[in-house]
Structure formats: C-alpha cells, structure tokens
C-alpha cells in the first residue's frame, strides 16, 4: 500500500487498497487511514453501487438524504449531475453535508464518474 500526503493538514491518496474487498481486515485499514488523514482518496476504484453501500455500512447505518432523492434502487446514493449549459451551482457555497442532524454523519463517500478539467472542486476542512 502506498500513501501520498496531499497537504500538511489533511488528505491522502491511497494506492494498492481494493475497495471491493469488504473484509473486516480491509475495512480496518480504510478506517484507520480515514481517522489519521481525515479525507482519503482512491483512484480508479470502479465499485458498483452495491459495493459502495457495503463499504458504507462498515461505518455505521446508512442514511437517506432528507432533501435530495436518492437513486431509484439505491436511495442512500445521491447522484449529482451537472449538464454543460446548466447554470445552477449545486452545493456551491461552503457547507458540511447533513451537519444539521442531531448526530452528524460519520463519513461521506463521494464517487466521481466524470470530473471536468476545470472547476468542480470540492474543498475539505477539519
């Protein structure tokens, strides 16, 4: 496994760890990395919605977004799509996902399908 630190404060890119492996041993590695680096990135992990949900369940009960409808067969997964000419800025301003809950979410899994060469940034804070 290779760990590349992305900044002095938080964030690491992880190579050599398969997110399809839902074993307790693999999850422990992922969870330990998350606790240490706060935000972790995995490239080219072509996981299915079922595999994404299985990974998420290791962190605790899955939640459905209160305001945004999830996917038809996967209500815990919200798909964010922006068309080329669309002017709306979904989540444009600084926010913390579902931080309004009495018990805030422990973790959020973002899976990027197509990332534009410019813009589309997601910022993180600890």
Summary of predicted features, one role per range:
Residues 1-126:
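Non-heme Fe(II) oxygenase catalytic core, chiefly the N-lobe of the double-stranded beta-helix
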């Amino acid at each position: 496994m290779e760990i590349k630190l992305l900044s002095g404060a938080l964030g690491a890119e992880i190579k050599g760890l398969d997110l399809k492996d839902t074993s307790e041993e693999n999850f422990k590695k992922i969870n330990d990395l998350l606790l240490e680096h706060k935000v972790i990135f995995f490239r080219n992990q072509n996981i299915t919605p079922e595999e994404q949900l299985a990974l998420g369940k290791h962190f605790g009960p899955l939640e459905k977004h209160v305001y945004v409808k999830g996917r038809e067969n996967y209500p815990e997964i919200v798909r964010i799509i922006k068309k080329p000419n669309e002017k709306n800025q979904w989540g444009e301003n600084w926010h913390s996902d579902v931080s309004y809950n009495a018990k805030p979410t422990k973790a959020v899994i973002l899976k990027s399908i197509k990332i534009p060469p410019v813009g589309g940034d997601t910022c993180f804070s600890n």
